Amino acid sequence: MDQPAPAPEPMLLDAQPPAAVACDKKQQEGEAPYAEGNDAVTGHIISTTIGGKNGEPKRTISYMAERVVGTGSFGIVFQAKCLETGETVAIKKVLQDRRYKNRELQLMRAMDHPNVISLKHCFFSTTSRDELFLNLVMEYVPETLYRVLKHYSNANHRMPLIYVKLYMYQLFRGLAYIHTVPGVCHRDVKPQNVLVDPLTHQVKLCDFGSAKTLVPGEPNISYICSRYYRAPELIFGATEYTTSIDIWSAGCVLAELLLGQPLFPGESAVDQLVEIIKVLGTPTREEIRCMNPNYTEFRFPQIKAHPWHKVFHKRMPPEAIDLASRLLQYSPSLRCTALDACAHPFFDELREPNARLPNGRPFPPLFNFKHELANSSQELISRLIPEHVRRQATHNFFNTGS
């Protein structure tokens, strides 16, 4: 089983959260209010106050906790219904140390992208034991990539390639956004943290409990990320890693969707490295230096790389194999970026003018890029946004008189 990632490094809390200050996406600097109806479990009603800033009226909003949908060392996630609107939401309830800011909350407030889970608002609650909990109210997405893959595996089927392309493309798009705009490294990319809407097939990256803004030269903990998806530099104990650890994890997810099972199913940290070496071969001294300079004198058994085309079944498209090989490189700097992955020929089918879901419905939005393209070359942008989409955008621009 995957090992749980440790609690992220704390952030100092500037002050205790006052009871009457609202916390929604428009109030970036506000603290969260407190809620009535504590110890929330299934069937309980939680009421809190939102608004009250920038001329907005305060209003009470109540949630009925319906069922627990996730548990972990962090706390619980439960599905809830807003009694005022009938909207279904997900509420992540985490124990809050009063001395520190919650990093997940700070990061989620800064993010806004179609392929990243969105924060609606948040509030604090307390228990009879005077424990303080932070409740993050998020949009509800019913499925995870893990459960979707399990559905196919249980039926002894492989996931259809069109869905592999659709889900992975959107995952890379979400990663491209968090890596470039807020500059965040997720640090726990895995199928369980990729949400899927079964009707629209829109994908959203979730669970930013391990995420962090990486600062060059500033050390980070290496014991991060669930084991099967852990980049080799983390296994080597590197502390000055980059967002390329997410790219490795995404490569592992791609391989898992193609194979129907994890590519590197290590039973321990050391065994994880053995599983990687069995496929990629023994890393060279230069590759080891790129991962962690302290290990260059360490002697590894010499094992030849297993050819990628033999890792996957014979009918696997060469574009899929090529993309996996570009993601799963020992040297972090040699892994392609998330945007480069989006532009890879493996995803060309998604860019065809008449491409649709197998049921005939349109794809979810795939080309509504945000600020992540700001520093991209014109050549990359032209590969990312197909001509028919650019033509339509130009047509709409002139027709609206903008």
UniProtKB/Swiss-Prot annotation:
PTM info: Autophosphorylated.
State the reactions this protein catalyses: L-seryl-[protein] + ATP = O-phospho-L-seryl-[protein] + ADP + H(+); L-threonyl-[protein] + ATP = O-phospho-L-threonyl-[protein] + ADP + H(+)
As given in the record, the signal peptide range reads: none
UniProt-listed GO biological process terms: brassinosteroid mediated signaling pathway; cell differentiation; negative regulation of brassinosteroid mediated signaling pathway
Q: Which gene encodes it?
A: GSK2
Additional note from the record: Plants over-expressing GSK2 display typical brassinosteroid (BR) loss-of-function phenotypes, and plants silencing GSK2 have enhanced BR signaling phenotypes.
Q: What Pfam family does this protein match (any one)?
A: Pkinase
Question: Which organism is this entry from?
Answer: Oryza sativa subsp. japonica (Rice)
Q: Which family does it belong to?
A: Belongs to the protein kinase superfamily. CMGC Ser/Thr protein kinase family. GSK-3 subfamily.
Name the record gives this protein: Shaggy-related protein kinase GSK2
